[in-house]
């Protein structure tokens, strides 16, 4: 039990039906995401149509998403439990920050990991820019290096955010950072969103370039393997653009709205403030969308690849028919010449 009692308005927010519905809504999103994630993993394992490094990075994003969803579910269940058990005890309903040390740090670590994963996906597409680059022959090594970078890099920003935090304060639930870390955390989030937007801009440039190059190869290159690799590169870049955009779409507004709410907190009713903040769990929605994107893109890539292969086969069949016709005509011509002389 905490030694700090919640104010009556805070206690009313935490025990309100609206907040309980919010917990149920977030947990429902998480449960659905587990089912779609299972399907997306099967697709990547059995029906993979992406380059090796891209696939491995998507696996790392999925695993991180599962961990984040589990942590979020535990945090929400604990908050829901407090709202029911301590509904009449405002002095026990809050969480001391020390009680949230493990959950909170893992929650924010997986949050940053997802953005570094987007950065790795972009680097993978950037290094694949040249079709004949040696990078294509070292996909497994590249994925190991990039995944290790994703694991290590979030530690730096998180250390800066939390190194001077006091864990004796109290929070409404474990998604709330200690008060000393709030502004620094929002600075990190704002920088993260800006970096993701820049990555999306350059990823779109790569996508457009790969699309133009693929169309040119249709008319200038007749090597099936080269055209196949070019088409695969174009489709993989498109998938990465969608993944980065989905994270910006989910994380960007939640970070921006939270910053605005904190700045104008005094002019916003407390109940609305905490209720809306509780819905702004951007990465939960991003993790919900990621497996859906993988499933959708897999179907699109498989469909377009079948069309592409069929076109190549039709062209080859047409070429063979053309040469067979020429051979037949040549045979007739030489036969006629033999009869004439």
Curated annotation (Swiss-Prot):
Pfam families: 7TM_GPCR_Sra. It comes from the Eukaryota. It is found in: Membrane. The chain crosses the membrane at residues 25-45, 57-77, 107-129, 142-162, 188-208, 242-262, 275-295. Keywords: Membrane, Transmembrane, Transmembrane helix. One of its GO terms (molecular function) is G protein-coupled receptor activity. One of its GO terms (biological process) is sensory perception of chemical stimulus. InterPro entries: 7TM_GPCR_serpentine_rcpt_Sra. It is a multi-pass membrane protein. GO terms for cellular component: membrane. Belongs to the nematode receptor-like protein sra family. This is Serpentine receptor class alpha-28.
């Amino acid at each position: 039990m905490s030694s700090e009692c919640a104010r009556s308005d805070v206690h009313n927010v935490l025990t309100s039906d609206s907040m309980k519905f919010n917990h149920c809504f977030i947990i429902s999103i998480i449960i659905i995401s587990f089912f779609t994630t299972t399907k997306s993993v099967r697709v990547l394992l059995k029906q993979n149509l992406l380059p090796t490094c891209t696939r491995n990075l998507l696996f790392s994003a999925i695993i991180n998403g599962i961990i984040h969803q589990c942590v979020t579910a535990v945090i929400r269940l604990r908050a829901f439990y407090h709202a029911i058990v301590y509904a009449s005890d405002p002095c026990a309903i809050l969480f001391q920050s020390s009680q949230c040390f493990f959950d909170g740090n893992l929650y924010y670590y997986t949050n940053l990991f997802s953005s570094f994963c987007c950065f790795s996906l972009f680097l993978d597409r950037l290094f694949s820019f040249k079709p004949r680059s040696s990078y294509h022959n070292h996909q497994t090594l590249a994925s190991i290096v990039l995944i290790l970078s994703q694991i290590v890099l979030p530690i730096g920003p998180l250390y800066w955010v939390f190194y001077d935090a006091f864990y004796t304060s109290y929070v409404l639930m474990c998604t709330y950072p200690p008060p000393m870390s709030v502004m620094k955390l929002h600075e990190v989030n704002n920088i993260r969103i800006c970096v993701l937007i820049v990555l999306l801009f350059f990823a779109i440039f790569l996508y457009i370039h790969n699309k133009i190059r693929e169309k040119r190869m249709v008319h200038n290159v007749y090597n099936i393997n080269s055209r196949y690799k070019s088409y695969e590169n174009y489709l993989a870049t498109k998938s990465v653009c969608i993944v980065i955009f989905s994270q910006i779409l989910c994380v960007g507004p939640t970070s921006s709205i939270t910053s605005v709410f904190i700045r104008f907190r005094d002019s916003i009713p407390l109940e609305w403030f905490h209720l809306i903040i509780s819905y702004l769990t951007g990465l939960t929605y991003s993790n919900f969308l990621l497996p859906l994107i993988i499933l959708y893109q897999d179907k699109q890539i498989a469909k377009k690849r079948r069309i592409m292969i069929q076109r190549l086969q039709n062209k080859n069949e047409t070429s063979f028919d053309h040469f067979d016709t020429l051979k037949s005509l040549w045979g007739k011509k030489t036969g006629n010449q033999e009869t004439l002389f």
